[in-house]
From Swiss-Prot:
Transmembrane segments: none
Molecular function as annotated in GO: ribose-5-phosphate isomerase activity
UniProt name for this protein: Ribose-5-phosphate isomerase A
Family matches, as NCBIfam families: PRK00702.1 (NF001924), rpiA (TIGR00021)
UniProt source species: Caulobacter sp. (strain K31)
Pathway recorded for this protein: Carbohydrate degradation; pentose phosphate pathway; D-ribose 5-phosphate from D-ribulose 5-phosphate (non-oxidative stage): step 1/1
UniProt catalytic activity: aldehydo-D-ribose 5-phosphate = D-ribulose 5-phosphate
Keywords: Isomerase
An annotated GO cellular component: cytosol
Length: 226
């Protein structure tokens, strides 16, 4: 089974968790897109809270009613992808440059389910470069401070994310620095250190937020819990 098929079946399994009347957080990325498509096919009376403009556009095209995070007291269920799923369902997210809105939606949710293909499940976080969202003003200086923190944790200095069109800018108008790491031995300590840097909006370490994971594998969908 291809990685894309594994993403698809995990997204379809997650869509079965949604019940009529729910407020549902809609994740961002290729795996989350499969969930949004499967959810739309069920034609339930729900409201979606998108984590990016890209997801909002897809949901509208598919006929899913949307609402803003500030217009709901809480979110019943959020389903989102991840770049890596490590021990205890610790996650690296942010490959789609939507980590800030994703984390805001996750933290407002009663239940969070992460979906992914089997390759995303790792023994130790860090092979995927850690995204860090940074205020655009003075970001070069912020990047230098991040490099100092990286050195403290025996990690490589972060790099400003670029695309064919130039610097990648998030929906919130910020930029992304990606920290190549290889192995993040102390995720909680690194997360705390990154938050001490003025100019850092947030980072892609999602710790103690996921309630379960649905992995698409060649044998079907496998459920993981912390």
């Amino acid at each position: 089974m291809s990685a894309d098929d594994q993403k698809r079946i995990s997204g379809e399994a997650a869509a079965e968790l949604v019940e009529a009347g729910m407020v549902v957080g809609l994740g961002t990325g290729s795996t989350a897109a499969w969930f949004v498509k499967a959810l739309a096919a069920r034609k339930l009376d729900i409201r979606g809270v998108p984590t990016s403009e890209a997801t909002a556009n897809l949901a509208r095209e598919l006929g899913i009613a949307l609402t803003a995070l500030d217009d709901v007291k809480s979110i019943d269920l959020t389903v989102d992808g991840a770049d890596e799923i490590g021990p205890g369902l610790s996650l690296i997210k942010g490959g789609g440059a939507a980590l800030l809105r994703e984390k805001l939606v996750w933290e407002a949710s009663k239940r969070c389910v992460v979906i992914a293909d089997a390759a995303k499940h790792v023994k130790t976080l860090g092979k995927f470069p850690l995204p860090i969202e940074v205020v655009r003003f003075g970001h070069v200086h912020t990047g230098q401070r991040l490099a100092d923190i990286a050195a403290e944790f025996d990690l490589l200095p972060p790099r400003l994310r670029m695309a064919d069109r130039g610097v990648v800018v998030t929906d919130g108008g910020n930029v992304i620095y990606d920290m190549p790491s290889g192995v993040i031995a102390e995720p909680a300590a690194l997360a705390a250190a990154l938050k001490t840097v003025t100019g850092v909006v947030d980072h892609g370490l999602f710790l103690d937020l996921a309630d379960e994971a649905l992995l698409g594998t060649d044998q079907g969908v496998v459920k993981l819990v912390p």
